[in-house]
Amino acid sequence: MKIELDVHTHTIASGHAFSTLQEMAQAAADKGLKVLGITEHSPGVPGTCHPIYFRNLHVIPRRMYGVELLLGAEINILDGKGNLDLDEDYMKMLDIRIAGIHSLCYEYGTIEENTHGMVQVISNPFIHIISHPGDGTAALHFEPMVLAAKEHHTLLEINNSSLKPTRNKPNARENNLTILRLCKKYEVPVILGSDAHISFDIARYDNLYELLQLTGFPEELIMNRDVKSFKEYLHL
């Protein structure tokens, strides 16, 4: 399968990643990508950049080494009400907006409360992608999320990093299989995410191909294959 884009990656600005923006862009060019998303963690994750970082993204060229850059953030979902940790004024400055649950800054609720919050975020017009919904950080009902994603043209991410053995996320494999099966059933597109924290991991989806094969997931529902389809679906 041809891959044209990877839009969930982090640079040293996130505080716990290990490559610069230019190193990431060069690696994307070396791998033949057309589009690279740089999505730094928002303030709820310890050690990440201050919100003023996002205010200054305008100084960065949107094309490096022949690769188009989408500069944005991975915004933290804070609770079962769907509250986020980055103000709308900052979100408006971003090319792409991902939202996800991280244990360091999430107020856990029941599975129903967690799911309600996630559906609220999926329906938020500022949010394009939900990061690693299947990693098991919070208990979730996936079917309402898939249906909401279809209604609002929000992409659910199938996250490669969550399936690394070193991540110790025992429910990630089965959760992602469930999400893929539901998305196939309801014909809902997904996005593959490397969640790269170092340049070598850009467009690395090696942990996902088995899941795609097991579910017989249609290639036409994978948004990484074609930049034009990706942008049209998200109205970018």
What residue ranges belong to the model's regions?
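Histidine-centered catalytic micro-motifs
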Residues: E4-S14, I38-H41, I130-G134, S194
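Short acidic/histidine-rich active-site segments
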Residues: V188-I202
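Short hydrophobic alpha-helical runs that function as membrane-insertion/retention elements
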Residues: L36-I38, E157-I158, V190-L192
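Conserved short secondary-structure transition element at the edge of the structured enzyme core
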Residues: N176-I191
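Metal-associated gating/positioning segment near the N- to mid-region
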Residues: I12-T48
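Histidine/acidic-residue-rich catalytic or RNA/ligand-binding cores of hydrolases
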Residues: G15-F18, G47-P51, A139-V146, T166-L180, ...
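Extended substrate/RNA-proximal surfaces in nucleic-acid metabolism proteins
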Residues: K2, A29, S42, G47-I158, ...
